[in-house]
Amino acid sequence: TGGQSAVRSGLIDEITSNLKEEGLEYITLGGVIPNPLLSKVREGIELCQKEHVDFILAVGGGSVIDSSKAIGYGVANPNNDVWDFCLKKAVPTGCLPIGVILTIAASGSEMSSSSVITNEETKEKRGCAKTDYCRPKFAILNPRLTYTLPQYQTESGCVDILMHTMERYFVNIETMEITDSISEALMQTVIYNARILMKEPDNYSARAEIMWAGSLSHNGLTGCGTGGGDWACHQLEHELGGVYNVTHGAGLAAIWGSWARYVYEVNPERFAQFATNVFDIPCGTDYKETALAGIEAMENFFRSVEMPTSLHELGLDLTDQQIHDLAFKCSFEDTRTIGVFKQLNMRDMEKIYLMAR
């Protein structure tokens, strides 16, 4: 579990009571924080090995689920160090089965094969082995469990959901009409309901729409026929999260507009399609003009739900050297590129961070 909210709400007591009634033995591990830490994962692996755990129930949001996946990998692969899976030095051959009771709509980890862990010693935030071994066996989605979330966390979650589809949507290849249509409808649904939740945090219908959108946005559905997606914004944000511990969705909002303006000219028609089909912006013969209008519309949405559109608004006033260091880390010390819509090298990454400042 994460912090104390699931305890205060009585959810943990309800779960443990049900387990006892069914005669199921259990142990608990709490204290998972946003941008979940490798040290907590190692603690969980040691606990599971000591107590001979054979199933993990993740009660929380993305950080709790991602930690559970990494713990599951570590227990099922005792001859490997779990961080080696994040560094791609090793590949897991299994994972403890995982179930989810979701309390935060955001990451989509309840239906995904992804997990992200932060090494607090090296300030690195890395994906931990993308395999179907860690995909949860079941997930219980009750929108009422999200009523008590603070507004900032709710809206950060909505941005994360949007970005999981947008990262797959903005590719520079021929895509499938059905996938595009699903993606565009999902984005419209999230935008519409995120605005409702600003005024009505206990609106069940809006919470339900957002919660289901979160699962559909990251289970692979919106990536069919897109070649896997771009993911540059996530890579750029991972460095912000790893070094400065920012909220993931808010970090994505702060970066996205600068990334979009930096790359849109590679394929302005794709951005124009986004503008027209998501924001109903008329598309004339000038795709670039329509594309920029769509980028501005998305940034205006971020502002309308009080999400940042710059690093300064995110609470980061970074020096040129700090931005250079972020790009150096994101490029794995100038040894890799990121993105597929436009491949970005270290210099490109630095320019986007500077634009976002």
Predicted segment positions?
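Alpha-helix C-terminal capping segments
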Residues: 50, 68-76, 92, 223-225, ...
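C-terminal charged capping/lid subdomain of soluble metabolic enzymes
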Residues: 133, 271, 278, 282-357
